[in-house]
């Protein structure tokens, strides 16, 4: 289209404009040289893109533009016209152009129809070629020659090239067939649309982007003319506009960016002409004319010998060309370096881009800059003409040189370089540097045509920069269009391509094999953030590939085993099978005897088995740390006294400290020791019990103690008595005052004294220490226990003590409450604590105490003093330590249980005090129970009533205090019918347990005390009958095997209990310290209850026969049940224990296995049976009244504690769930109490195979085992082609096979002449007719890939193998740009929670610290500030230009100046400024200048960069800051600081306009 136009001319200068888009012209403009004098010709110069007029331009000369006017040319002409002739003439011109355009368009009658969309005929061949290369990439991945990342990159590259070549074919098709095709004209004239959209209409839609901008591998091959399939339609919508909501959100974020920009710079207005600054910025180079245009020179510039351009000159376009040509450093002024305080001066700003002349005064350049920067974001977010998510690559691939015709390659010389691997997995040659002569030929292609003269195509060195890729080699034959060279366009861009990670998973389960894996393990480098957490320092070691790695996954069935009990020390898992064994389904693979290194309890809950560990485990494992524990206990618990006797408890104590309840356990053990001391009155029994405690204390000296048990006990008892006089000063005095409740403060002193005593005399002090020690650990509680022992010495004293004991109970409670507080006067503060915790408890306790005191006196008189005193002592202890008191002399085994029980109570108490109000209630209820039980001990009579009421209400009582108090009162009444009461108690206990069991089960500590026993009893009732039958049968079967031996052993045990014990101790010392301890406890218990044993002669007989096996023992118990109903209770508990330990139906099996274990440690296990809860119950039933009283408290404890406590504690802290797989068989065994001993198998597990196949191996990793089986489906058999005559021999046939057994073959590898493998794998077998291959997949790992597996790992399906890293191609779209631009404007330090490496603040600080070393402070400050300003401007402009948006540099500079206008004070000196305060740099410079003149010290400061939001909020104008964000915070601070707002800038009057109107009205 040629247009002629006449217009008037003024004095025409070379126009100072230059179209920014001129580089995008689709046509070339050629110079026209007309020698005729008529009409003057205006020439468009291609190089400078400006219009030059001949010098002899005549007035009113018509100008002729002989060129096709598209959009950009029109822009250029109108801009020049405006500059030359002003606005009025330009408006007329544009109006005329519009009319001409409409007129011509109407005449042409161009229309657009469906038939105008002509699809290029080459499309089908292009698509088929692309799909072939896609198949090749998939095969290369299958063969292990490509990584998955390279495959996807190659696919994307292939389809991108296909799409591009299709576009070119479409354009060529239009030009060749119909140059006036309306679609073609519309796109190429710039009227509407662009080539990208025409491509979608007639070629193919191409690759699509997902919402994150990443390219999808699936290209849309259709175009809009053909129509899209459903899949293609969904894909094309996925990345295009991503829905209206998305657009709305993005528009909001783009608008918010504009608002922040406006708020930050709205006050920047041109007020002054010249700030007289000495600072500026420099440009140098050949391509700086755009940068110079419109700026003002800072210094004079010498152009040549004759001309000097003075400073403060505005650089026009012609001057810019001249300045760029001289290639010198040009100093110009910039808004960054303007010296005005808050705005910019006229000369620093320079040209007004809208007017084309120097900016006027009063121009709001800040808001113009903000709008110029913010508008592209809004506009581009909304640009509906965008290509719709079609992948348009940022940085289109490298410039390529295809072969123009078929020919042969010839190189002139050897080229330096190296082979590299491209992102698409191709191996090419990288040229390191270019030749010395740029005109020299790099390579030439010579056509191989025979008929014509050969054609030659040459590529010169200057065309191919260093870093280019060479795709052909010397002498290679090339085809037309084949890629020869890719020229690199290496850009020094700081913007890194986004790096993405790709996870590679195994497609099937199997075994891993590393073929070649060059691995480097690096510990993660922690970026130095503002606050690094200490946790970050222990980071996992990462394993990277330092080069390409190859590995395989061989298919097999992997069966995982969830056991964490596999033998980890040896690092092996034992199996019944060896490699190559054939396994059928449900075959046991291996057997595990589950052994636990700790002592614990097994409990069955629903379908799972829980292992609860008791306190004992610590005793066993940590015997040697007693001294350490000792100190820990002192430090932690304010318990000053921990004697050597308490060693066992001490060891437990520190261990349990990890769990909150552990400390309590320790205390319990102490209480039990104290009980033993009380029982010292009975010489034999006392000595045994004492030994037991000592044994617990000193494992190493067990033998010696055993040998001289009687001596030691006697000595200790003597000491005790004798110490009574000595102790009266220290210990005894303490106890007496406690009893009398004379002074509590004495107790503390006494405790300290006790500690001293221990240090002085370990042996003697041990006894005393035990009692005292108890007081210390339980603080007052233990002290009370000591008093009981003294009472036992003198019956009268005992009675008195009991009275005191009533008071003591209250003391005990107080101690428990104030256990951690250590109050000086324990009585008063303890009572207070009780009151606070619950009034009911205090009242109930007090009543019980008073009644107890009275009753105890009368009862004691009637019955034997020694027995009563013992029971009384127990009662006192029980009140203090709920569980401990019950078993003082009864059972050593029960004693261990007691420990656990006491610990539970103590724990609950401590928790109450320290932690939870809710728990306090429950704990208090427990305390009441303890008191009740203790009262029972004191008054055996009351037991009767107790049995009736308590059986049903005891558990409830724990919840309701009133019921308990009633039971206390009723206790006093009945003394006569003791035995009958006992029987009732037993029955009621059973019922009681059943009723209460469900309600209390859920509670942890509470449940342990009360409900667990009940629960067990339930089990006993239900399973009891069955057990009896089963066990009896077993007896019959097994008696013949070991009757003789067993009988002998049993007899020995029964008759000579003590000597047996000594022998056992000697034997056990070497093997199991734990077992020894248990056995000791059991035997002394038997002595205590020796009468009961004698009573049941049948029991003795039964024991000898079944002794060898646990079954027999159980039978003995059964016989007891038959003999006496009283024992019946105890027996069920025994049975129930067994049941609980075993899983549901495997009880019989468990018994059998137990017999085996017994043989190993025969003596130890038998005592355990006797010493369990069962014994307690038996004693209760059979013991004399005195014994019964003692036992009854034990019974209550057993209900609440002995069974349940350890398990609930474990559920809270230590319990482990043992997860059993369904496919496996379990046989459980455990002792009666459900206790599990160390090194004794609790169950035998048979792991069964889940599949049929060939066993490969077992692997242990991370405490989990897995087995590998090769199934039939994991192998493939190839039938060899029967091409060979049948006569030929086997060997010759074999020779034809190109592979060998054990070889790894890849997809496509030739295995037989002319035949390739259709899969990858390892050859297992080669015969005459077939080859068997184990399926496998080879993988390729790229450099810097993260490896997650190790050699020979057994992997389940979808297991992560490695993480590949790649730089991802992304679409260019402002959608990706806005977050980046916002990140720069806000000077963000973090992104997605991770610190950005080399962020603005890091760069500024590091540059400033470096500059300070070299330069003086002020110079370093200016340098670093200018550095970060220029860096920020450059990065922002780069981010915009990546989106195809050009913004004038000065706009960005105005904004960046505001972001760096403040500094941070580091040291205020004489300025009264605070460190960390932000202040305007110009203001601070004024302050410092005046300080220096007054000879004071100026403030020190450092440069900072504030994001837009922070700089607005830091603004001096509080109205601006409050209108932006955080209104109330800003206004309150400003009011407190009494700030004044001077209403500078454009927006302030808007905020207060309404106020000023009101003032006028007033």
From Swiss-Prot:
Keyword tRNA processing (UniProt): no
Function (record text): DNA-dependent RNA polymerase catalyzes the transcription of DNA into RNA using the four ribonucleoside triphosphates as substrates.
Similarity comment text for this entry: Belongs to the RNA polymerase beta' chain family. RpoC2 subfamily.
Free-text cofactor note: Binds 1 Zn(2+) ion per subunit.
Catalytic reaction annotation: RNA(n) + a ribonucleoside 5'-triphosphate = RNA(n+1) + diphosphate
Protein name (database record): DNA-directed RNA polymerase subunit beta''
Cofactor: Zn(2+)
EC numbers, comma separated: 2.7.7.6
Any one GO cellular component localisation term in the record: mitochondrion
Name of the gene encoding the protein in the UniProt record: rpoC2
Gene3D superfamilies for the chain: 1.10.132.30, 1.10.150.390, 1.10.1790.20, RNA polymerase Rpb1, domain 3 (1.10.274.100)
Amino acids binding Zn(2+): 275, 338, 345, 348
Subcellular compartments: Plastid, Chloroplast
Compositional bias of kind Polar residues: 11-22
Ranges where the record places region Disordered: 1-22
InterPro entries on file: DNA-dir_RpoC2_beta_pp, DNA-dir_RpoC_beta_prime, RNA_pol_Rpb1_3_sf, RNA_pol_Rpb1_4, RNA_pol_Rpb1_5, Rpb1_funnel_sf
Quaternary structure and partners: In plastids the minimal PEP RNA polymerase catalytic core is composed of four subunits: alpha, beta, beta', and beta''. When a (nuclear-encoded) sigma factor is associated with the core the holoenzyme is formed, which can initiate transcription.
UniProt xrefs under PANTHER family: DNA-DIRECTED RNA POLYMERASE, DNA-DIRECTED RNA POLYMERASE SUBUNIT BETA
Signal peptide boundaries: none
NCBIfam families: rpoC2_cyan
CDD domains found in the cross-reference section: RNAP_beta'_C
Leading EC class: transferase
Entries under HAMAP family matching the protein: RNApol_bact_RpoC2 (MF_01324)
Coarse class of the protein's main subcellular location: plastid
Organism: Chlorella vulgaris (Green alga)
Swiss-Prot/TrEMBL keywords: Chloroplast, DNA-directed RNA polymerase, Metal-binding, Nucleotidyltransferase, Plastid, Transcription, Transferase, Zinc
